[in-house]
Protein backbone atom coordinates (compact mmCIF):
# COMPACT_ATOMS: atom_id res chain seq x y z
CA UNK A 1 0.00 0.00 0.00
CA UNK A 2 1.22 3.57 -0.75
CA UNK A 3 0.85 4.57 2.90
CA UNK A 4 3.03 1.64 3.99
CA UNK A 5 5.72 2.41 1.42
CA UNK A 6 5.82 6.06 2.53
CA UNK A 7 6.06 4.99 6.17
CA UNK A 8 8.88 2.56 5.35
CA UNK A 9 10.79 5.27 3.47
CA UNK A 10 10.54 7.63 6.44
CA UNK A 11 11.69 4.88 8.80
CA UNK A 12 14.80 4.33 6.69
CA UNK A 13 15.68 8.00 6.33
CA UNK A 14 19.21 8.72 7.60
CA UNK A 15 18.95 10.58 10.90
CA UNK A 16 22.41 10.27 12.42
CA UNK A 17 26.09 9.93 11.57
CA UNK A 18 28.62 7.61 13.19
CA UNK A 19 32.27 8.49 12.58
CA UNK A 20 34.87 5.73 12.93
CA UNK A 21 38.45 7.01 12.72
CA UNK A 22 42.01 6.21 13.73
CA UNK A 23 42.90 7.23 17.28
CA UNK A 24 46.69 7.19 16.93
CA UNK A 25 47.42 10.36 15.00
CA UNK A 26 46.36 13.79 13.78
CA UNK A 27 45.14 12.46 10.44
CA UNK A 28 42.57 10.26 12.16
CA UNK A 29 41.51 13.01 14.56
CA UNK A 30 41.21 15.72 11.91
CA UNK A 31 39.34 13.35 9.60
CA UNK A 32 36.78 12.83 12.37
CA UNK A 33 36.55 16.60 12.88
CA UNK A 34 35.82 17.10 9.17
CA UNK A 35 33.16 14.38 9.33
CA UNK A 36 31.64 16.14 12.35
CA UNK A 37 31.40 19.39 10.39
CA UNK A 38 29.71 17.45 7.59
CA UNK A 39 27.19 16.05 10.08
CA UNK A 40 26.39 19.55 11.31
CA UNK A 41 25.99 20.83 7.76
CA UNK A 42 23.50 18.03 7.06
CA UNK A 43 21.67 18.36 10.38
CA UNK A 44 22.59 14.84 11.52
CA UNK A 45 23.11 13.69 15.10
CA UNK A 46 26.81 12.90 15.53
CA UNK A 47 28.80 10.30 17.41
CA UNK A 48 32.45 9.33 17.02
CA UNK A 49 34.52 6.28 17.88
CA UNK A 50 38.29 6.68 17.69
CA UNK A 51 39.95 3.29 17.45
CA UNK A 52 42.92 1.23 16.29
CA UNK A 53 43.30 -1.97 14.30
CA UNK A 54 43.33 -4.29 17.30
CA UNK A 55 39.81 -3.17 18.25
CA UNK A 56 38.04 -3.79 14.93
CA UNK A 57 35.94 -6.66 16.26
CA UNK A 58 34.23 -4.59 18.96
CA UNK A 59 33.89 -1.54 16.71
CA UNK A 60 32.18 -3.41 13.88
CA UNK A 61 29.92 -5.14 16.37
CA UNK A 62 28.82 -1.64 17.41
CA UNK A 63 28.39 -0.59 13.78
CA UNK A 64 26.11 -3.58 13.20
CA UNK A 65 23.76 -2.32 15.91
CA UNK A 66 23.17 1.06 14.25
CA UNK A 67 19.91 1.97 12.55
CA UNK A 68 19.22 4.64 9.89
CA UNK A 69 22.77 5.92 10.32
CA UNK A 70 25.40 7.18 7.89
CA UNK A 71 28.59 5.33 8.89
CA UNK A 72 31.74 7.15 7.74
CA UNK A 73 35.04 5.34 8.31
CA UNK A 74 38.27 7.33 7.87
CA UNK A 75 42.02 6.69 8.09
CA UNK A 76 41.58 2.96 8.66
CA UNK A 77 42.49 0.30 6.13
CA UNK A 78 40.62 -2.97 5.83
CA UNK A 79 42.18 -5.44 8.28
CA UNK A 80 42.40 -8.67 6.25
CA UNK A 81 42.64 -10.86 9.35
CA UNK A 82 39.08 -10.05 10.42
CA UNK A 83 37.56 -9.23 7.05
CA UNK A 84 34.56 -11.45 7.79
CA UNK A 85 33.91 -9.59 11.05
CA UNK A 86 33.98 -6.30 9.15
CA UNK A 87 31.72 -7.67 6.43
CA UNK A 88 29.19 -9.03 8.95
CA UNK A 89 29.06 -5.74 10.85
CA UNK A 90 28.60 -3.63 7.73
CA UNK A 91 26.00 -5.94 6.19
CA UNK A 92 23.96 -5.93 9.37
CA UNK A 93 24.12 -2.13 9.57
CA UNK A 94 23.01 -1.75 5.96
CA UNK A 95 20.10 -4.14 6.56
CA UNK A 96 18.97 -1.76 9.32
CA UNK A 97 18.82 1.25 7.03
CA UNK A 98 22.43 2.42 7.32
CA UNK A 99 24.73 3.62 4.56
CA UNK A 100 28.52 3.15 4.49
CA UNK A 101 31.18 5.62 3.33
CA UNK A 102 34.84 4.58 3.70
CA UNK A 103 37.63 7.12 3.02
CA UNK A 104 41.22 5.94 3.33
CA UNK A 105 44.77 6.13 1.96
CA UNK A 106 46.26 2.76 2.93
CA UNK A 107 46.84 -0.30 0.77
CA UNK A 108 43.70 -2.36 0.03
CA UNK A 109 43.38 -5.84 -1.46
CA UNK A 110 40.89 -6.52 -4.24
CA UNK A 111 38.94 -8.75 -1.87
CA UNK A 112 38.63 -5.95 0.69
CA UNK A 113 37.50 -3.47 -1.97
CA UNK A 114 34.82 -5.86 -3.23
CA UNK A 115 33.62 -6.45 0.33
CA UNK A 116 32.71 -2.78 0.72
CA UNK A 117 31.46 -2.10 -2.80
CA UNK A 118 29.20 -5.17 -2.76
CA UNK A 119 27.14 -3.73 0.11
CA UNK A 120 23.57 -2.59 -0.47
CA UNK A 121 22.41 1.03 -0.18
CA UNK A 122 25.00 2.69 -2.46
CA UNK A 123 28.27 2.32 -0.53
CA UNK A 124 31.08 4.80 -1.20
CA UNK A 125 34.75 3.77 -1.06
CA UNK A 126 37.51 6.26 -1.83
CA UNK A 127 41.11 5.05 -1.51
CA UNK A 128 43.94 7.30 -2.66
CA UNK A 129 47.57 6.82 -1.62
CA UNK A 130 48.59 10.32 -2.76
CA UNK A 131 46.67 12.07 0.02
CA UNK A 132 46.17 11.65 3.74
CA UNK A 133 42.71 10.63 4.96
CA UNK A 134 41.75 14.13 6.11
CA UNK A 135 42.49 15.50 2.64
CA UNK A 136 40.25 12.84 1.11
CA UNK A 137 37.49 13.59 3.64
CA UNK A 138 37.78 17.29 2.84
CA UNK A 139 37.59 16.75 -0.92
CA UNK A 140 34.70 14.25 -0.75
CA UNK A 141 32.57 15.70 2.04
CA UNK A 142 33.30 19.42 2.51
CA UNK A 143 35.29 20.73 -0.49
CA UNK A 144 34.24 24.37 -0.01
CA UNK A 145 34.71 24.54 3.76
CA UNK A 146 37.78 26.60 4.72
CA UNK A 147 38.04 25.16 8.22
CA UNK A 148 38.08 21.65 6.77
CA UNK A 149 40.74 22.75 4.28
CA UNK A 150 42.87 23.95 7.18
CA UNK A 151 42.38 20.69 9.07
CA UNK A 152 43.43 18.77 5.96
CA UNK A 153 46.62 20.86 5.61
CA UNK A 154 47.55 20.16 9.22
CA UNK A 155 46.96 16.43 8.77
CA UNK A 156 49.02 16.36 5.55
CA UNK A 157 51.97 17.99 7.32
CA UNK A 158 51.91 15.36 10.06
CA UNK A 159 51.06 12.27 8.02
CA UNK A 160 53.71 12.94 5.39
CA UNK A 161 56.13 13.84 8.21
CA UNK A 162 56.93 17.25 6.71
CA UNK A 163 57.15 19.03 10.10
CA UNK A 164 56.72 22.42 8.41
CA UNK A 165 53.74 23.66 10.46
CA UNK A 166 54.43 24.33 14.14
CA UNK A 167 50.85 23.79 15.27
CA UNK A 168 50.67 20.48 13.39
CA UNK A 169 53.72 19.12 15.21
CA UNK A 170 52.29 20.37 18.50
CA UNK A 171 48.95 18.69 17.83
CA UNK A 172 50.76 15.42 17.12
CA UNK A 173 52.38 15.61 20.55
CA UNK A 174 49.07 16.55 22.16
CA UNK A 175 47.34 13.51 20.64
CA UNK A 176 50.14 11.29 21.95
CA UNK A 177 50.01 12.83 25.44
CA UNK A 178 46.25 12.42 25.70
CA UNK A 179 46.22 8.94 24.19
CA UNK A 180 49.07 7.57 26.32
CA UNK A 181 47.50 9.16 29.41
CA UNK A 182 44.17 7.48 28.72
CA UNK A 183 45.81 4.10 28.17
CA UNK A 184 47.83 4.40 31.39
CA UNK A 185 44.65 5.23 33.35
CA UNK A 186 42.66 2.55 31.51
CA UNK A 187 40.25 5.20 30.22
CA UNK A 188 38.53 5.32 26.84
CA UNK A 189 40.78 7.05 24.30
CA UNK A 190 37.75 8.45 22.47
CA UNK A 191 36.43 10.10 25.64
CA UNK A 192 39.84 11.61 26.40
CA UNK A 193 40.29 13.03 22.89
CA UNK A 194 36.69 14.22 22.52
CA UNK A 195 37.18 17.77 23.92
CA UNK A 196 39.98 18.45 21.41
CA UNK A 197 37.99 16.80 18.61
CA UNK A 198 34.98 18.99 19.37
CA UNK A 199 37.02 22.21 19.31
CA UNK A 200 38.65 21.20 16.02
CA UNK A 201 35.21 20.53 14.53
CA UNK A 202 33.90 23.87 15.75
CA UNK A 203 36.78 26.18 14.84
CA UNK A 204 39.63 24.23 13.28
CA UNK A 205 43.12 24.70 14.72
CA UNK A 206 42.18 28.14 16.06
CA UNK A 207 39.92 26.33 18.51
CA UNK A 208 42.89 24.75 20.27
CA UNK A 209 46.00 26.68 19.18
CA UNK A 210 47.08 30.33 19.53
CA UNK A 211 49.33 31.38 16.64
CA UNK A 212 50.42 34.55 18.46
CA UNK A 213 51.71 32.82 21.59
CA UNK A 214 52.67 29.59 19.78
CA UNK A 215 50.90 27.64 22.49
CA UNK A 216 47.77 25.61 23.09
CA UNK A 217 44.89 27.61 24.54
CA UNK A 218 44.57 24.96 27.25
CA UNK A 219 47.41 25.79 29.68
CA UNK A 220 47.33 22.34 31.29
CA UNK A 221 47.68 20.67 27.88
CA UNK A 222 50.65 22.95 27.19
CA UNK A 223 52.39 21.79 30.35
CA UNK A 224 51.68 18.15 29.55
CA UNK A 225 53.08 18.53 26.01
CA UNK A 226 56.22 20.34 27.23
CA UNK A 227 56.90 17.59 29.76
CA UNK A 228 56.20 14.91 27.15
CA UNK A 229 58.66 16.44 24.68
CA UNK A 230 61.48 16.59 27.22
CA UNK A 231 60.78 13.09 28.48
CA UNK A 232 60.54 11.46 25.05
CA UNK A 233 63.77 13.13 23.87
CA UNK A 234 65.64 11.52 26.78
CA UNK A 235 64.03 8.15 26.11
CA UNK A 236 64.79 8.24 22.38
CA UNK A 237 68.43 9.20 22.90
CA UNK A 238 68.81 6.25 25.25
CA UNK A 239 67.06 3.90 22.81
CA UNK A 240 69.24 5.01 19.89
CA UNK A 241 72.36 4.42 21.94
CA UNK A 242 71.43 0.72 22.04
CA UNK A 243 70.51 0.29 18.37
CA UNK A 244 71.40 -2.67 16.15
CA UNK A 245 72.70 -2.05 12.61
CA UNK A 246 73.36 -4.25 9.60
CA UNK A 247 74.05 -3.63 5.92
CA UNK A 248 71.54 -5.64 3.86
CA UNK A 249 71.41 -5.51 0.05
CA UNK A 250 73.59 -2.40 0.22
CA UNK A 251 71.22 -0.58 2.59
CA UNK A 252 71.89 0.43 6.18
CA UNK A 253 69.12 -1.13 8.28
CA UNK A 254 68.73 -0.04 11.90
CA UNK A 255 66.52 -1.52 14.62
CA UNK A 256 65.69 0.28 17.87
CA UNK A 257 63.41 -0.56 20.77
CA UNK A 258 60.67 2.02 21.32
CA UNK A 259 60.39 3.00 24.97
CA UNK A 260 56.93 3.41 26.48
CA UNK A 261 55.31 6.77 25.72
CA UNK A 262 57.06 7.15 22.35
CA UNK A 263 55.56 6.48 18.91
CA UNK A 264 57.28 5.02 15.86
CA UNK A 265 56.67 8.37 14.13
CA UNK A 266 58.49 10.20 16.94
CA UNK A 267 61.38 7.77 16.74
CA UNK A 268 61.46 7.93 12.95
CA UNK A 269 61.69 11.72 12.94
CA UNK A 270 64.24 11.80 15.75
CA UNK A 271 66.45 9.12 14.21
CA UNK A 272 66.47 10.80 10.78
CA UNK A 273 68.04 13.98 12.17
CA UNK A 274 71.78 13.83 11.50
CA UNK A 275 72.55 16.46 14.16
CA UNK A 276 70.80 14.37 16.80
CA UNK A 277 72.64 11.23 15.71
CA UNK A 278 76.01 12.98 15.69
CA UNK A 279 75.42 14.24 19.23
CA UNK A 280 74.93 10.62 20.35
CA UNK A 281 77.80 9.18 18.31
CA UNK A 282 79.86 11.16 15.74
CA UNK A 283 80.04 8.01 13.59
CA UNK A 284 76.27 7.39 13.61
CA UNK A 285 74.62 7.99 10.22
CA UNK A 286 70.97 8.16 9.19
CA UNK A 287 69.79 4.66 8.28
CA UNK A 288 68.23 3.83 4.93
CA UNK A 289 65.58 1.81 6.76
CA UNK A 290 64.67 2.25 10.43
CA UNK A 291 62.62 -0.35 12.26
CA UNK A 292 61.14 0.63 15.62
CA UNK A 293 60.15 -2.32 17.82
CA UNK A 294 57.56 -1.66 20.53
CA UNK A 295 57.38 -3.52 23.83
CA UNK A 296 54.30 -5.32 22.54
CA UNK A 297 56.10 -6.56 19.43
CA UNK A 298 54.71 -4.07 16.91
CA UNK A 299 57.04 -2.77 14.19
CA UNK A 300 57.23 0.71 12.71
CA UNK A 301 59.09 1.24 9.41
CA UNK A 302 60.55 4.60 8.33
CA UNK A 303 62.99 5.29 5.52
CA UNK A 304 65.87 7.72 5.78
CA UNK A 305 66.18 8.20 2.02
CA UNK A 306 64.74 6.99 -1.29
CA UNK A 307 65.57 3.51 -2.52
CA UNK A 308 63.71 1.73 0.25
CA UNK A 309 60.04 0.65 0.23
CA UNK A 310 58.69 0.52 3.78
CA UNK A 311 55.38 -1.04 2.72
CA UNK A 312 57.20 -3.93 1.02
CA UNK A 313 59.38 -4.47 4.10
CA UNK A 314 56.33 -4.35 6.39
CA UNK A 315 54.58 -6.94 4.25
CA UNK A 316 57.22 -9.44 5.37
CA UNK A 317 55.90 -8.92 8.90
CA UNK A 318 52.15 -9.13 8.25
CA UNK A 319 51.85 -5.39 7.73
CA UNK A 320 51.67 -2.67 5.14
CA UNK A 321 51.44 1.07 4.62
CA UNK A 322 53.27 3.52 2.40
CA UNK A 323 56.70 3.51 0.71
CA UNK A 324 57.91 6.15 3.19
CA UNK A 325 56.27 4.72 6.34
CA UNK A 326 54.54 1.50 7.31
CA UNK A 327 53.67 -0.79 10.18
CA UNK A 328 53.89 -4.50 10.90
CA UNK A 329 54.04 -7.02 13.71
CA UNK A 330 56.80 -9.24 15.07
CA UNK A 331 55.06 -10.56 18.16
CA UNK A 332 55.92 -10.73 21.85
CA UNK A 333 59.60 -11.18 22.58
CA UNK A 334 62.17 -11.28 25.39
CA UNK A 335 65.59 -10.93 23.74
CA UNK A 336 66.08 -7.77 21.64
CA UNK A 337 69.31 -9.07 20.07
CA UNK A 338 67.63 -12.33 19.02
CA UNK A 339 64.71 -10.42 17.52
CA UNK A 340 67.07 -8.12 15.61
CA UNK A 341 68.98 -11.08 14.20
CA UNK A 342 65.71 -12.67 13.10
CA UNK A 343 64.47 -9.46 11.44
CA UNK A 344 67.79 -8.94 9.66
CA UNK A 345 67.62 -12.53 8.37
CA UNK A 346 64.07 -12.06 7.07
CA UNK A 347 65.02 -8.86 5.24
CA UNK A 348 68.13 -10.49 3.78
CA UNK A 349 66.01 -13.21 2.13
CA UNK A 350 63.87 -10.70 0.20
CA UNK A 351 64.72 -7.82 -2.14
CA UNK A 352 61.24 -6.45 -2.81
CA UNK A 353 61.77 -3.71 -0.23
CA UNK A 354 64.84 -2.42 -2.08
CA UNK A 355 64.06 -0.17 -5.02
CA UNK A 356 62.95 3.24 -6.18
CA UNK A 357 59.41 4.48 -5.60
Describe these PLM feature segments.
Residues 187-227:
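Long, charge-rich alpha-helical interaction segments
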